[in-house]
């Protein structure tokens, strides 16, 4: 019997924000079988920043993203020196 993959649940707390004139997408999601939420912030060039930490609530995840964007500013999220590239096969 083939096991079905769990569905991805997107939070209603996900949103788009503009910081220092740059648009960012705050994406908050979890697998339907999980209790904790994943936080991802995507900049205007499509670069994704995913938190290692999981969040007990989608509200906590959203607040963390907003606080980080406010404290660090848009440029900190757009620097290339803080990105770990995927390994090439």
Regions found by a protein language model. Name each.
Residues 25-27:
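A short linear hydrophobic-aromatic micro-motif
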